């Protein structure tokens, strides 16, 4: 018990140090017009009050640093490294979904079973600039498919927006990160097409598999403001066990992800998605959405409030359904540092005769420095 208390105190001290020191020390650093270094350092502490589980709190501190070298407007070399202390509540809670979707300590070690630690991405990109509004780019290396697929202006960043896994990306969409692959980005005026192909080292069953994803997007400018409308389809090779654990099946899914400004103060978003259940899956559908409220409403232009809800329909395993509600207030202290107060309500409903059903509230405080 004393060891656990010491761990909690140490984690709180790390977060306090993050709040107290970073406004002075975190500086954007552009070495020259071709080479730049940036990153994000975050600390979060979450405490759960949950039925059918222990009330407890945990923290984590992830740190990511990235380097970009662009010798000219057509060529770019990029690398990102990730480090973390602690796994937060993610490996402690009985909920199916992670309360914080960040890359934490276990996530940055032996990535995808490749025996690779800390190196998240490293890639080269070449862009054909066919006209002022027409570009075609090709990327190859160790990539993150979520950099190209399932974007959302208001619900896509676990360090500055929602924390819960279901409000960052769709859990049904099985979009992989940090492995070998290539990406295509084609943009003509307001239309865009993106495609991703990846070879992933291993899934939960230890099988290597191929991932294929494509996204069609359109950006609409109207008197309300800018809106982004996307349709994503993805599929894997036949390397995922079925419910009985006997045969291997594909994963196949489709997602729509929309975000729209509603004037200068408000914004709204949705993410709906479905996947087949030939393979064993926790969820076969997600229906999520929310609103963003700019701090301009109370004369703090850089602050914002985010409110989001997700309903996930259970697949062919034990879960009947999961509901998530999350709200946060993000207080921007300066151009580098922001604090977020976060509250989540989660409820897992299981099929008859399954595990006791957890439901409850998770309170969180997150500090994020971007440089």
Give residue ranges: language-model regions:
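Surface-exposed coil loops of outer-membrane beta-barrel proteins
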Residues: 92-123, 131-215
């Amino acid at each position: 018990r004393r060891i656990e208390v010491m761990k909690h105190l140490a984690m709180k001290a790390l977060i306090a140090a993050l709040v107290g020191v970073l406004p002075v020390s975190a500086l954007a650093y552009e070495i020259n017009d071709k080479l730049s270094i940036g990153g994000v350092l975050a600390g979060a502490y979450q405490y759960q009050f949950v039925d059918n589980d222990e009330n407890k709190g945990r923290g984590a501190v992830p740190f990511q640093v990235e380097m970009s070298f662009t010798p000219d407007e057509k060529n770019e070399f990029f690398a990102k490294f990730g480090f973390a202390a602690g796994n937060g509540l993610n490996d402690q809670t009985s909920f199916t979904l992670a309360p914080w979707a960040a890359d934490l300590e276990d996530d940055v070690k032996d990535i995808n079973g490749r025996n690779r630690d800390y190196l998240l991405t490293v890639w080269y990109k070449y862009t054909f600039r066919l006209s002022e509004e027409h570009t075609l780019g090709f990327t190859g290396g160790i990539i993150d498919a979520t950099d190209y697929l399932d974007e959302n202006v208001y619900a896509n960043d676990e360090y500055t927006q929602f924390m819960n896994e279901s409000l960052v990306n769709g859990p049904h969409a099985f979009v992989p990160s940090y492995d070998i692959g290539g990406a295509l980005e084609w943009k003509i005026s307001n239309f865009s097409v993106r495609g991703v192909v990846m070879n992933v080292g291993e899934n939960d069953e230890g099988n290597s598999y191929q991932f294929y994803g494509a996204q069609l997007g359109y950006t609409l400018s109207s008197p309300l403001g800018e809106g982004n409308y996307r349709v994503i389809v993805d599929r894997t090779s036949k390397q995922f066990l079925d419910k009985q654990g006997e045969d291997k099946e594909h994963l196949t899914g489709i997602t729509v992800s929309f975000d729209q400004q509603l004037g200068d103060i408000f914004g709204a978003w949705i993410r709906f998605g479905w996947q087949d259940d030939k393979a064993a899956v926790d969820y076969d559908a997600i229906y999520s959405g929310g609103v963003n409220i700019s701090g301009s409403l109370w004369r703090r232009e850089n602050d914002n409030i985010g409110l989001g809800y997700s309903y996930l329909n259970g697949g062919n395993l034990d879960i009947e359904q999961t509901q998530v509600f999350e709200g946060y207030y993000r207080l921007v202290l300066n151009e580098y540092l922001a604090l977020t107060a976060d509250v989540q309500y989660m409820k897992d409903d299981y099929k008859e005769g399954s595990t006791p059903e957890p439901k409850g509230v998770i309170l969180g405080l997150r500090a994020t420095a971007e440089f």
